[in-house]
Amino acid sequence: MNNGVEVRFFAAARAAAGVDHARFASAPLSSIIADATRENPLLAHVISQCSFLLDSVAVHDKNILVLDGSIIDVLPKFAGG
């Protein structure tokens, strides 16, 4: 039995979210992002600068449908080379 989509926040995204992970219903990535940031303007700002992995694969199309059992990693930009 799957329990929705797990979203894992890292670094500045974790600090802004106040949690290291959250669960959401299956939906397009853009909807999951909207749900995650709806009442958190700081997270909305941070997440706008993040990249996303869906089941360990980089995602560039936020309209992609994220299915139950999937894991999204929210990764802020990192300094360094």
Each model region followed by its residue ranges:
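Ubiquitin-like/PB1-type beta-grasp interaction modules and other compact soluble beta-rich domains
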Residues: 1-80
